[in-house]
Amino acid sequence: MSHIRVAFAPLDTNPSTCGLETFATQIETLSQMMTAEEMKAELYDCVRRILREQKFDQIRENEAMLRLYKVMGRSSTNLKGRGIYEQLFKKDHFTGSLKFYLQWAEECGKDQMLEEFKDVLKLARDRLSERIEMTAIESGFRDLVDEYFNGESGDMFTRPDETMDLFRFNAGSKKKRRSSVCFLQHNVPINNSGKAAFGPKTKTDLRQACIDRPNYHGISIEEFRFAKWKDTFGEDVDDDYRKRKDSGVVFVKHQVIDTDRQAREEVENRFNANLNPRRRHLSPVSEKTVDDEEEKRSRIYSPLVATKDAHRPALRSKIENPPATVTLSSDTKSASEKDVSDSDDADDDERLKIMTAGRKDGNPPDRSTSISSNYSTASARTSKSGAGLDLMAENKCLEAHAMFSDTVHLASEKTMVLGDDSVFVPERSLATTQIVTDFSVLCDPDPTMTITQERPKKVSNGLNVVYDEAAEPEESQKVEESEVQPEIVLVSPVTQTSPATMFNDIYDDEIEFGFFKPSRGNFVTSTPAQGVHLVNIDEYFGNKEEESTHEQEAPVFVAPTSSTFSKLTRRKSLAANQAVQPSVTESSKPERSDPKDSSIDCLTANLGRRLSIGADEIPNLTENNESEITGCKIRRRSEIIKQGDINPWDETLRKKLMCLVRPPQNMHEFQERAPKIQALRDCEVSGEKLHIQTLIGQGGYAKVYRAVTDDQRTVAVKYEVPSCSWEVYICDQMRNRLKDRGLELMAKCCIMEVMDAYVYSTASLLVNQYHEYGTLLEYANNMKDPNWHITCFLITQMARVVKEVHASKIIHGDIKPDNFMITRKIDDKWGKDALMSNDSFVIKIIDWGRAIDMMPLKNQRFKGRAGTEAFDCPEMVDGRSWTYQADYFGFAATMAVVVAGKYAQLTGASVGDYSLNVDIKRRNILRDACYDVINRFLNIPSCDSLPDWNILIKSFSEIWNEKFEASGWRQAVSKFNEACDLAANQK
C-alpha cells in the first residue's frame, strides 16, 4: 500500500474535519518527497472518492480541501491551478470562502494574468462584500499584487462604496491605529436618550453609568487615564479589555501617581528600545563660541598659558615649526592706570631694544618680570576710557573670529603702508585718543608687548598687526611685485543711469517703509567675523545720498606722534583727503586697471530687482597692496594668506553685492531697538503680534522660537543678535533664480522662505514657515536601522536640491544634517516613480547665513576654514583654494549620518587618500555607491574639475529601479512616518 493510501485510511474510516486537516497536512509533506506523476495518480483517486461518495458530504466543502486542490494544481498538466479553481467555481464550491479566491488569484499571479486577476477580485467583492469588510477582502489581494505584479495596482483597489463612507459616522482612516480610549468608550452603553453616556462634554455620572450596574464591570478613571497615556505615546490597546477589572475600587492619590509613573517608564523604555543602543544620540554641530570654563579658570592664575586655538591639534599628521611672532593688535583692551601715565617714547624704545635683542639668538626675551601685571584673562579685560574709568569688557572673540579677522602680517621691515579696509565705512570723527592695549589673550603663545599708540575713535575693532619674525623681509619680496595681482572689480549691469535717476529710483514706491533711515547696527550672519566695523542701514542697502553728502570727508588713520611706533608701522587711508594727508602728485597716484578683464562678472538680467548703479560709483573691494586673512592651514593666526585671496564672508563684500539689487519686499527695517523675545510671552513687531510658545532651537548666533500669529498660523521666529540681512538676500536670490529657470515647485518646496524679516538696530527677527517633523539629524537619531529605500530616497533628493543650488551660482557653505528640514510625511500611495518626481520632495534646506553668491564672484577662489566642527572640507584643512568643495564635503558628511547614524571623521593626508571613517553595513544595498561618492567628493583635484551631480543621481536611480520592492517600500515609509510623528511629539 502506498503512502497516500495509508494517510487516507483514517479519513476513509471516520470522515471528519480533523481527519481531513490531518490528511491535507500529510499530502503537503508527501508532495515534497514524491514525483508529480506518483502524486497525481494516487491523490486524484482519493479526491475523486471525496467528491462522489455520500459519507464525505459534510467535509466536501471544508476549506481544508483547498489545500488538496492546491497540491493537485502543481501536478496538473491540462487544467493547471487556474483551471481547477474555475471548475470549482462553476460547481458553486467555496464561492463564499475568501481563501478560495485568494488561491485562485495567486495562480493568476504566477501566470502573470492581470486581467484574470482583476476578474477574480471582482468576483470576491461581489460574493463576499455582504459578510466581510472590503478592507479585509482587499488586503490579501494587495499582497499578491506586490508579489507578482510589482505593486502596479493602478485603480484596482478603488472601493465601489466610497460614496457611502461620506455618510458613515466616524469611518476613520485606513491603517489608523486603534485608540485605547475609543475601545474603553465602546464598552460604555448608550442611554435611552441616544446620547453618549461617557466622553467629552457629557454630564453623566461616571460611576452610575459605567460601574454601578448589575452584571457589568465598567472602566474606572484609572483605566481611562492609562488608556489616554497609551494613546498619547502611540501604544496599542490591550485586547483583554473584556476581562474583569476592579473598577469600583477607589485608590488613594499617591497610588494613582505611582501607577502613572510606572506607565510612563514603561512607555519610555519601549521608545528607547527602538533606538540603536550601540551609538550615542547625535547632537547638532556648531561653531565654537567661547573657551570652556575649565580653560578660562586655568588662565586666571596663569596668564601666559596659550589659548585654546594654540593648543588645538592639527587635523593632519604634519609637523610644522610655527614662526615666533610679536603681536600688535587693537582688538583687546587691558591696561592699568600706571601704564597710561608712564608709557612714553622712551619706554617704547626700551621695549623695542628688548624685542630686538630677543630676536638675535632666536629666543624671545623673558617678560615675566616686566609686563606680568599687564596681562588680563580671556574672560574679562579692563579698558581705560578717556575719563579714566575702568570698564570691564566680556571677551567675545570666537574661535572662528580668529580665523577670519582683519590681520596683516609684516615682514622684518618695520614699516608698511596699509590700505583702508573700510571702503564703505561712513565718516567718523578724526579726533585721536591714547589707548594702552594688552595683547596677552591672542592665540599665539609668543611674547607680546604693550605699546601706546594714537588712533581715531571707532566703535568697531581696528586692524590687527601681527609681526612674523620668521617671515622674509619685505625687500626680498619686491621681486614678486612685478607679477600681476588679481584685482576685484565689479562690473555694473548693462543698463547705466545717471546719479539723478538713481536717487529717484531708491525712493520708488515698491520699497518698504523704513529704508534709508539712519540706524546704527552691525550686520553679521551665522558666519564668524571679527573686526566688523559699524555700518548703518542706509549705507548697507546702497543709499548713495548719504555717501555723496560726505564724500569729501573720508575716514583716515593718523600716524601717532610716537617715533617708535612710526618705525614699526603706519596706516593711511586709500581715499584722498587734502585736510589730513599731503598732496599726492599725478605721477604717484595709482592707476585703476581696466575692468574689461575683471575676474568678477556682472550680475545677469535675471538676478532680480536691481538698483541702477554705475560702475564708476562702486569702488574696488580690495586693493592690490592689501593682504587679508581668510583662514589658516592648521588654525593659527600667524598663517599668511597670499595677496589676492578674499574672504567670502567679508561684510564689506556682502554689502557691495546687496547694493546691486533692491531689498526684498518682505524686509522691514526700523531704527529703534529690537523687542525682547521670551517663551510664553507676546511680542509685537511692526504692528503684528506674535504669541511666542517655546524655544525649539538654539545655535551660536541665533535662537529659534515657535510662535503663533494673530491669524492662528504657526511660524518659526529666528531671533539673531546682532541683526542680519544676508540670509534674507540670499534666500530671495535663490528662489528667484530657480523660478527664472522654470523650477517654481522646487523653489517653493526645497528652499527656505523668509515670510517676513524685521531688521532692528540691535537684532533681527526672521519669520519662517514652521515644520514640525524636525531635521535629518532628528530622523537619524530616531531610526534604529533605516531601510535602504528611505536612505536612497533622501540622498537622491538632497543631491537634486544641491545640484540646482550650484546651478544657480550659489554656495550654501553650511550643509549638514540639521540644516535639512523634513517638511512632510511620505505618502504611502507613492510608488516607484516617486524618486525623481517633482511632487515628492520632503526636505527643505535652511540656514543660508554662510552662503556665497558666486554669480558676481565668477572665477574667484577662496582660502581659509569655515570653523564648523567635522564639516571643514579637505581643501580648507590643507590651505588649498576652494569654491563649491565646501558643499560637496558637507553633502558627503550628511550622507554618512543618514546612512550610518553617526558623525564621520575626516581621514587621510593628501588628495587621493581622503575618506570618512564611516561604517556602512555589508547588507546595505547602497554601500558601494556611498563609498564611491565619498571618494569622489573628498578627493577633488582642483576647482576646475568638480564632480558631476548627475552621475550621483543616476547611480542611485539605477539601484532604485533595479532593487525596488513595493512591500519593502511601504514598510520603510511607515517607519519614516513614525519617526516624523516622534519628532513632532518631542517638540
UniProtKB/Swiss-Prot annotation:
SUPFAM superfamilies, per the entry: Protein kinase-like (PK-like) (SSF56112)
Top EC category: transferase
Intracellular or extracellular location(s): Cytoplasm, Cell cortex; Nucleus; Chromosome, Centromere, Kinetochore
Domain Protein kinase stretches: 690-987
Annotated Polar residues bias: 575-587
GO cellular component, one term: cell cortex
Residue numbers spanned by region Disordered: 278-385, 574-599
Disulfide-linked positions: none
A GO molecular function held by the record: protein serine/threonine kinase activity
Compositionally biased region (Basic and acidic residues): 350-364, 588-599
Low complexity biased stretches: 368-380
Active site: 814 (proton acceptor)
Record field: catalytic activity: L-seryl-[protein] + ATP = O-phospho-L-seryl-[protein] + ADP + H(+); L-threonyl-[protein] + ATP = O-phospho-L-threonyl-[protein] + ADP + H(+)
Key words of the record: ATP-binding, Cell cycle, Cell division, Centromere, Chromosome, Cytoplasm, Developmental protein, Kinase, Kinetochore, Meiosis, Mitosis, Nucleotide-binding, Nucleus, Serine/threonine-protein kinase, Transferase
Phenotype of gene-disrupted mutants: Embryonic lethal. RNAi-mediated knockdown in oocytes results in aberrant homologous chromosome segregation during meiosis due to severe pre-anaphase spindle defects characterized by disorganized microtubule bundles. Delays in the processes leading up to exit from mitosis including delayed activation of separase, which results in a delay in the separation of sister chromatids, delayed cytokinesis onset and delayed chromosome decondensation.
Effect of residue 847 to N: No effect on embryo viability, severe loss of mdf-1 recruitment to unattached kinetochores and probably loss of kinase activity
GO biological process: one example: neuron development
Similarity comment: family membership: Belongs to the protein kinase superfamily. Ser/Thr protein kinase family. BUB1 subfamily.
Subunit structure: Interacts (via kinase domain) with mdf-1 (via coiled coil domain); the interaction recruits mdf-1 to unattached kinetochores during mitosis and between homologous chromosomes in early anaphase of meiosis I. May interact with bub-3; for localization at the kinetochore and the onset of anaphase.
Protein name from the UniProt record: Mitotic checkpoint serine/threonine-protein kinase bub-1
Organism this protein belongs to: Caenorhabditis elegans
